[in-house]
């Protein structure tokens, strides 16, 4: 069984959940979410809000970090993967197989070797399940 806790933002919460031995922690990078992990402005541009940096660096096995994105521009995904050292990218929008394939080629091996990509697909009928076949080989 794999346990993923999603929507984490607070450093103390991340520490506590990590101590429980969860496998993955999800960081929401969708601005419309109340659990959105924001980037903060600096004079040199946009940098990640690293207030919680190192919160899971206590000698224990670190949970894998999953970045959750909805219809985000690929360059913003690449920036977040790099800045947050994400292990997984989870896509919840209308991302095409071509976009996902291009994203993977950009990230692996140069920026984040071995990164995993998850594509969430809403299923309401049998045709939606068939649509999943379009993503074979790119996720």
Q: Where are the regions a protein language model picked out?
A:
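Conserved N-terminal beta1-alpha1 strand-loop-helix module at the mouth
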Residues: 1-139
């Amino acid at each position: 069984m794999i346990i993923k806790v999603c929507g984490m933002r607070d450093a103390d919460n991340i520490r506590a959940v990590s101590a429980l031995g969860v496998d993955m922690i999800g960081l929401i990078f969708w601005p419309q979410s109340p659990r959105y992990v924001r980037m903060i402005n600096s004079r040199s541009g946009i940098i990640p809000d690293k207030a919680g940096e190192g919160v899971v660096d206590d000698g224990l096995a670190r949970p894998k970090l999953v970045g959750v994105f909805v219809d985000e521009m690929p360059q913003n995904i690449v920036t977040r993967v790099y800045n947050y050292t994400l292990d997984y990218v989870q896509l919840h929008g209308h991302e095409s197989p071509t976009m996902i394939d291009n994203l993977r080629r950009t990230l692996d091996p140069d920026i984040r070797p071995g990164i995993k990509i998850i594509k969430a697909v809403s299923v309401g009928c049998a045709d939606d399940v068939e649509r999943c076949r379009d993503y074979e080989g790119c996720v």
